[in-house]
Amino acid sequence: MKTRAVNHPKIFDLPKLRDRVHVFRDRARAGKVLASMLDEYRGSDALVMGIPAGGTAVAVEIARELHLPLDIAVVSKITLPWNSEAGYGAVAFDGTVMLNEELLSRLNLSDHEIQTGIKKTEQKVARRVTMFRGDRPLPDFKRPIILVDDGLASGFTLRVAIKALRGNGAGNLILAVPTAHSESMQMILEEVEAIYCPNLRSGLSFAVADAYELWSDLGEQDVVRILQGFGNASGAV
């Protein structure tokens, strides 16, 4: 499928899907669309890495379509004590921690509360790494890495994943997301080599779920099922 750069040679989208909602039936369909945009990597030495939970369902379709290996980059936001949906930072699979200092400067959180949140999130990430990857060592990151999520809203967790991958030797990072807000994409643009996003949107209101006809949150067991299904079909994860 032909792609087109938007105002920057590193951004590739699908013009017919710009500023539209409900353009994908589900995450699986979004993954297939992205795979068609990433066809140059078919059968290459690239590695597809999904961000659990939702990104795994997109990533598995890219890996299947392009005959590439699949792995995951576990990342979790550090949530506020009074709001589990909002976060002031994130922790990545290798222990990388990134805090939103601008947000923290506006919050009345004590150092103890901040450190407690970090510790709890580190434990959660470690548990998920074991659940999803077992005791397998980290893969070789010195090859093209296609980092996949189901959408790009604020971009904070993606930035933590990118920082962790860079810290482990990744030199060629390609971000693949079905949908993104244009301003968030600009913020993350210089941190990767290329961004593939079929549904690029702008405006005051943005929700990742609006790109999909069918949307539901995925849990840990959904991720395990997806990874096991891919492993059974391909012989490796």
Feature locations, PLM:
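PRPP-associated nucleotide enzymes
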Residues: 1-237
